[in-house]
Amino acid sequence: MTEQTKRTTIVLFSGDYDKAMAAYIIANGAAAYDHEVTIFHTFWGFNALRKEELIPVKKGFLEKMFGKMMPRGADKMGLSKMNFAGMGPKMIKNVMKKHNVLTLPQLIEMAQEQGVKLVACTMTMDLLGLQEKELLDDIDYAGVAAYLADAEEGSVNLFI
């Protein structure tokens, strides 16, 4: 009996720290169990892929506004519940540190080290005015058709 390749795909739509944490915890767990894993980042899920530093790029007015409204980098994302004007993320990160839980940036780095394929949705990049140099290095760029091709082969497909 031949062993079939196990595939996990995750659409990360949410821009919330806790939901992105869940996506990356699942991705790292699946990769540890020898799954081929793809995380397809779209809309607010792009917050996890943005570089923290300001990258000078030429943009129109609306694209500049999106850039200012979206958190720059995974560590700047808010919580889905109990954000408390930014105090919630500080509190949960403090609790995570006490319990030796990896931060979202560390989980992203671990995922890349394990070969998890991080994909940025090119249509969303166009809509939000994001450019490749504003995003993390070593990620892929593709449209929804590429995600669907991966998902069609997936044994686990999640939307977060």
UniProtKB/Swiss-Prot annotation:
InterPro entries tied to this protein: DsrE2-like, DsrEFH-like
Signal peptide: none
Annotated transmembrane regions: none
PANTHER family to which the protein is assigned, alphabetical: CONSERVED WITHIN P. AEROPHILUM (PTHR34655), PEROXIREDOXIN FAMILY PROTEIN (PTHR34655:SF2)
Protein name: Uncharacterized protein YrkE
Gene behind this protein: yrkE
